[in-house]
């Protein structure tokens, strides 16, 4: 899937290993953009699965316009403590609302180090795969605008936060690049044996979206293999 043609000034992207940011990467490449993927390592329980997904996805994508992955550490164990994102206990299951997966201050934590890195390396654009309907206050236009202004004041440089999917649903973005190796992505709060658990909030969201794709959902879920213990 190598990209051809010229590329423009570099745009960084927060790449999580999930569906949304993978599609955003493909979308940027379609526009002839040279992309700098950035992964924020937070030590949440899904980190190893995300890192593996990103490595495999980028290898298969094989785009000359994608720069080597930058990984920045923002460990959260001291902040989140016994939260389910650290322990894996009482993970929000498929019956819960989007609000149940709140991670306190997630976007500020993900953005601050990535934006500083961009500023230090002369990159003026950072793209996020935030979708329409995100219920959290740190995904609002006001937050992104004010956060970017604060960083600009602190560093005397401008890093613009791009959110090209902000007015789109997951079903709509899936239609943009259904040819991507999306089976390699991971969208799970509690991976089991390298597979999606199949019973968490994010697995339910993933399954609902992918089953509408041609060929259906290719994901192998651990609960279908009897690999999920009773922690939910």
Predicted regions: what they are:
Residues 1-180:
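ATP-dependent adenylation/nucleotidyltransferase module used to activate substrates
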Residues 62-64, 75, 200, 217, ...:
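Serine/threonine-rich low-complexity intrinsically disordered regions
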Residues 93-95, 180-186, 205-212:
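A polyampholytic, Gly/Pro-enriched intrinsically disordered region
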Residues 108, 112, 186-208:
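Local cysteine-cluster metal-coordination motifs and their immediate loop/turn environment
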Residues 174-177, 182-192:
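Short, intrinsically disordered, charge-biased short linear motifs at domain edges
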Residues 204-210, 215-232:
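Short Fe-S-cluster ligation motifs
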């Amino acid at each position: 899937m190598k990209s051809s043609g010229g590329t423009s000034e570099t745009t960084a992207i927060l790449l999580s290993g999930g569906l949304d940011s993978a599609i955003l990467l493909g979308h940027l490449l379609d526009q002839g953009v040279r992309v700098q993927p950035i992964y924020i390592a937070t030590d949440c329980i899904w980190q190893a699965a995300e890192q593996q997904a990103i490595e495999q996805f980028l290898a298969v994508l094989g785009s000359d316009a994608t720069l080597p992955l930058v990984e920045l550490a923002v460990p959260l164990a001291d902040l989140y403590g016994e939260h389910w994102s650290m322990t894996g206990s009482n993970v929000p299951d498929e019956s819960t609302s989007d609000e149940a997966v709140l991670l306190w201050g997630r976007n500020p934590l993900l953005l601050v180090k990535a934006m500083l890195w961009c500023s230090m390396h002369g990159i003026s654009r950072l793209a996020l795969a935030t979708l329409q309907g995100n219920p959290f206050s740190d995904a609002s236009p006001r937050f992104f605008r004010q956060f970017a202004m604060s960083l600009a004041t602190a560093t005397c440089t401008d890093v613009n936060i791009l959110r090209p999917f902000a007015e789109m649903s997951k079903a709509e973005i899936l239609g943009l690049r259904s040819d991507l190796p999306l089976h390699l992505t991971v969208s799970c709060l509690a991976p089991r044996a390298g597979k999606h658990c199949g019973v968490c909030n994010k697995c339910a969201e993933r399954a609902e979206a992918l089953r509408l794709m041609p060929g259906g959902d290719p994901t192998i879920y651990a609960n279908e293999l009897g690999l999920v213990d009773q922690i939910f």
